Amino acid sequence: MKQFVLKLYIAGRTQRTEQAISSLKEICEKDLASAYELSVIDVLERPQLAENEKILATPTLVRELPPPLRRVVGDLSNRERVLVGLDLAVRDTFDQEKN
């Protein structure tokens, strides 16, 4: 089973960031089962991490593993957009068409 390592960069704890976290956790539970590790990083509390990773906007979701590195910036409530950004939707669609 593949292990996905995800980092979500947010700016403060607001209703919008809580919604982004909730949406992302829901997508991960449904589509990645337990094969993921999610870290939430507040760029206001840890600006050096954001600078090192060149995070210019929030929310930004970074898939570190498996390679290649992928980023999804902005609205995380759209499941399909997040899965395409993580490079999962195309693979899932292809697998369904084969069966």
Describe each model-derived feature in a short phrase.
Residues 1-28:
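Local sequence-structure signature of Cys/Sec-based thiol-disulfide redox active-site neighborhoods
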Residues 19-22, 26, 48, 80, ...:
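Solvent-exposed alpha-helical segments within well-ordered globular domains of core cellular machineries
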Residues 58-70:
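A short, hydrophobic beta-strand/beta-hairpin element that forms part of a small beta-sheet core
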